[in-house]
């Protein structure tokens, strides 16, 4: 057992110091075309130490967790911070916050690490069986879970201990007919294994049926259209195009279309964008970020007006802003500004009302990735499938649908959001780090270029 009181004393160096101690366990199962390719378990422990001296950071990590090693790391980080300060060209100010003492758990109803590996394997196999069809030529299913025990302490007096689990499952298939290849995919996950048990069967069938539907799809028309984005694609747009542009580190690097726009209108009155780490059970939720700041509900855009950026303690200090609890890190990496669960606030429309009111347009569903330039404010996404809207009804299934345009232009042209609410699960990459996130909202109607 570590002597945490001793470690707290060791942190009394420089102007600020913090330590993250992680104990982790992970499990992975992968299946490809009916055969289990991998069943593995792993354990990983580690320590990350940051020390601030004037305007210089020192940061070190180790996979050895012992009091002797921790003392060495703190001393090394302190020396590095002093050297870094000599070459620093910017002032570093950490936003003040009240010290926290807490011990918490975020595990869900069923701890995935308590579920027998045989039960997990049977669910993987059952998923595969429900995705089979004579036109389905390839199926892959993967499952992973992680359990982590974390200890976080800072020289300002916080000591936070937590236990967290997450599990996620991906299912993918490829359908083929007369040389035509189409793709279907779904995913589910959360803090508890119940998210897998409750959802995997329906999602397996949906992935299969989507691939089969797309075999009969016609190419999507190109041009400027009134479009409805489903919650998944709307969420990807909000996350990638709006959420990243609201991250304060990108703003400070002059790499955001939202720079110098606080208090200004950046979208229509129907656009309210929220980042919320407190949603119970959502994949991107957390009690505290990796700087010990409590996770919060942050309104980024309210009725079209840009209200705030997302912050770490350092960016909040530099911009004299309120803390938002978005300093996150993957494993032992440095905390940087990251989203949690980011979504567009639901509106008043039902989907049926919105469809009937649209008359002519295109309904875009799902996301197959894309590109965003947050500095120039440009984006391009690919939808998984689409439908032609004629006389307020969904008619022809469409394939090869893309969405592109200017971020602000799309936001200003939003004129309706449905009242249903969905959050997708996944991981977001930035600066070589991947963290769990959620994104979504309701269906969104706007005008965009379909490409």
UniProtKB/Swiss-Prot annotation:
Protein name as it appears in the record: Metalloprotease MJ0996
Catalytic EC class: hydrolase
Known EC number: 3.4.-.-
Native source organism of the sequence: Methanocaldococcus jannaschii (strain ATCC 43067 / DSM 2661 / JAL-1 / JCM 10045 / NBRC 100440)
One Pfam family hit: PmbA_TldD_1st
Disulfide-bonded cysteines: none
InterPro entries, per the entry: Metalloprtase-TldD/E_C, Metalloprtase-TldD/E_cen_dom, Metalloprtase-TldD/E_N, Peptidase_U62_metallo, TldD, TldD/PmbA_N, TldD/PmbA_sf
Family indicated by similarity: Belongs to the peptidase U62 family.
One record GO biological process: proteolysis
Task performed by this protein: Probable metalloprotease.
Keyword Hydrolase in annotation: yes
GO cellular component: cytosol
GO molecular function: metallopeptidase activity
Gene3D superfamilies: PmbA/TldD superfamily
Alphabetic keyword roster: Hydrolase, Metalloprotease, Protease
